[in-house]
Amino acid sequence: MVAYLNIHTAYDLLNSSLKIEDAVRLAVSENVDALAITDTNVLYGFPKFYDACIANNIKPIFGMTIYVTNGLNTVETVVLAKNNDGLKDLYQLSSEIKMNALEHVSFELLKRFSNNMIIIFKKVGDQHRDIVQVFETHNDTYMDHLSISIQGRKHVWIQNVCYQTRQDADTISALAAIRDNTKLDLIHDQEDFGAHFLTEKEINQLDINQEYLTQVDVIAQKCDAELKYHQSLLPQYETPNDESAKKYLWRVLVTQLKKLELNYDVYLERLKYEYKVITNMGFEDYFLIVSDLIHYAKTNDVMVGPGRGSSAGSLVSYLLGITTIDPIKFNLLFERFLNPERVTMPDIDIDFEDTRRERVIQYVQEKYGELHVSGIVTFGHLLARAVARDVGRIMGFDEVTLNEISSLIPHKLGITLDEAYQIDDFKKFVHRNHRHERWFSICKKLEGLPRHTSTHAAGIIINDHPLYEYAPLTKGDTGLLTQWTMTEAERIGLLKIDFLGLRNLSIIHQILTQVKKDLGINIDIEKIPFDDQKVFELLSQGDTTGIFQLESDGVRSVLKKLKPEHFEDIVAVTSLYRPGPMEEIPTYITRRHDPSKVQYLHPHLEPILKNTYGVIIYQEQIMQIASTFANFSYGEADILRRAMSKKNRAVLESERQHFIEGAKQNGYHEDISKQIFDLILKFADYGFPRAHAVSYSKIAYIMSFLKVHYPNYFYANILSNVIGSEKKTAQMIEEAKKQGITILPPNINESHWFYKPSQEGIYLSIGTIKGVGYQSVKVIVDERYQNGKFKDFFDFARRIPKRVKTRKLLEALILVGAFDAFGKTRSTLLQAIDQVLDGDLNIEQDGFLFDILTPKQMYEDKEELPDALISQYEKEYLGFYVSQHPVDKKFVAKQYLTIFKLSNAQNYKPILVQFDKVKQIRTKNGQNMAFVTLNDGIETLDGVIFPNQFKKYEELLSHNDLFIVSGKFDHRKQQRQLIINEIQTLATFEEQKLAFAKQIIIRNKSQIDMFEEMIKATKENANDVVLSFYDETIKQMTTLGYINQKDSMFNNFIQSFNPSDIRLI
């Protein structure tokens, strides 16, 4: 047997368990000369199939299984490409099927693409004669060995192969159950799904007509198609007046260079070099295309990032507006982006604000045509955790067992079932019974198979021809996709550009828009000063919550130690704070603060490493060192850098000799050459592209600038981006309060779905209120825009439709203070809800009928709700306090220590808090303990109560009260938590503090005369405490006398002072 003509691979999603590599391996073992891939309706697997076959000297045949219909009957059909034209026909046929979601193919559609195909009808019966007869003039039409005889039609033996061996039949049933969302025991007749890969011995045992087998070879020999890689498929840019792209590009570049206030001669020299490299490689159209779409974005209110990746190292990119990073100013290398000695497609990735990215994609589609632009397919796979749960589900495991499985497989990226099996608890689960062992066996066979398709997050393919001429297409959720992955499409030669959506650009754009609208200030982010000391003070304090690249706890810690003073410090931090180079951070900080400690292996390293204090941080530095010492061109230096990062021993040894020889010819001793090579080899693994670091540091700086100068607008927009996450919202509210920003309750006449900045503070989003959905907010805001602000609560009730105006909505709005601006207490408005809901307040408001038919609404004024209840409702509906936290409300004036004021060094200092969360757990020894979250209204702190303390204080933790806690700080993973040693209710603490006071200090003597009889000149007994007066104006303490704690007037004396005017010691 020399060929298999009907292989269904795992890319026939959930229909086959046969991986391409396994199909090829089996073919090799059986001395098969040719394989045909024939997945149903799709060509997903073509590139991998082609590569695997060629690598193993097997002839690849490209085909597809379809279902052909005449409207009445349907016949399974295999179509095979005879040549490259047939291959293109397959692309288009599959594209037609997938783009139009066709289950069946009409014989008319098949005829359109059949000239260069071999057609094999399967299991043809009498009812299919009409379909077969349509193709009677088609010379390469066959029927399979299970079909009836039809005059003039040859038969061929063809076996649908979709799993490896006979023992793997259960995989097809399992895949069918997963696909159909049913139970495994409901799937029957596995034979209908296909067969295993038959061995030559098994085929010989079958009673097959020899002529049928002969036709297999005939068909295999007729098929001769191949995938063509690295084609020149770049689209051509339409220039004005049909000017050549080269001439037009040069004219645009020189014109732009003359506009800029730069050293013309220096920049022109660099420009000529880059232009020559680009045009010699034939990439002039590419740069013009990218420039055009970025120009569209910038002129259509879509914010574009300053650059991404190595493209910021190109002066051409800078002059075309593709980047806003001057590569000469920042000492960036063009060869890191485009290497003239290693011809590859340039890779320009573009960041757009995420909320408007689709506008640019739509522009590209309109410019080039719908069939000329597509996204890129990606595949989700049955990885360990997913396959374990899927197979458990179809085998009928209950939810408890499924959850047990999930808990037994670690949350580790890329973990395999074999790795999980090394864990004792997982192994015990597998061998608990025969059912579990069968479950594990099926899981192992399905692990790694593609399960579903999705869309690549960023990649867009563009061509000036319909894309199905070069690759098959399918339909995704938001448009067309190539059926091949990003790397496969690029290997063919198609132009791929990454259109990435960056949330931080949306935040910046929104801030700029609001500042211009509200304050009349037009901020040009290209003209802001990049040496603003207030920005560097913010960074030095680590106040970088919400700032791109700088908001993790680890980076904040580094910033506090480093104390950035200039932009280069930000670039360095964003490059160093990654696995690998992190170990150099202490060295960098030490040298940054004391440059005398900088040491260089050789003086010629100083010009290259001076800005980074002798530490190699950037890939460009490695290239510069190779150029300086070994006289490498930057192209050669980039090849060296790539070789070092890939750690290919043979290539590395060759490059080492190349480097040492070059250094020798350049006048360096062999010993120092070897040391320099070893130095750059050490850092090559994690050197960071400086061009990318500069680009992203610019975004970080811009956000820092906006946070410093427009904090209300900054925090409002950061908060708007975390709507829906109660935890993140509470964290950002907490951070904003720490910065002194007033958080205002939702205001029915000011608030939107998003947070609204104002001069007074930030209005909370109406969408933050639990139980108030987006549609309700939309109705409220739309009504306000169309008919003006609401005059009062009853006006609101009249204008909002009944379907929205529910008791639940009204109560929520009232209890968070959304109507406070109308001057009525929340309790008064709660009382008015019945009037609103009982009366018909949605009568048409035009004309006097409204006045006659609408009953007069009256408020029944009530006293305001108690402060504690107001705070409780705000916490319930918003997840945090707005009016005032209980800690703030009553006790900050007494100068208690709070989390916000607590330093890491203040162990065992009593602090005033509420317990936000108490999570009780049981230790391995069966003892109870708890993890808690403490809150003081401004900041939260994680705490832990170990078993001994938990026994003492468990009962207290059930009370919603204010507490004084103390303990010791523990620092892990750069986060602090308090190991709690003691807990007291505030009331108990106050009593004890009063009972044991040794001195009373007052700051206001206005009440003193009322208690003159209590004050004694000298101490007479143990119950007497010192009474002192502290004069703030002269900063002096005076002893007034003594008072007796047992005196009947003592408590009255204490209560007569404002909390801020008295202190007990």
UniProtKB/Swiss-Prot annotation:
Gene Ontology MF term list: 3'-5' exonuclease activity; DNA-directed DNA polymerase activity; nucleic acid binding
Subcellular location: Cytoplasm
InterPro entries per record: DNA_pol3_alpha_NTPase_dom, DNA_pol3_alpha_thumb_dom, DNA_pol3_finger, DnaE2/DnaE/PolC, DNAPol_HHH, NA-bd_OB_tRNA, PHP_dom, Pol/His_phosphatase_N
GO biological process: DNA replication
Class of this enzyme: transferase
PANTHER family: DNA POLYMERASE III SUBUNIT ALPHA
Protein name: DNA polymerase III subunit alpha
Record organism: Staphylococcus aureus (strain COL)
Gene transcribed to yield this protein: dnaE
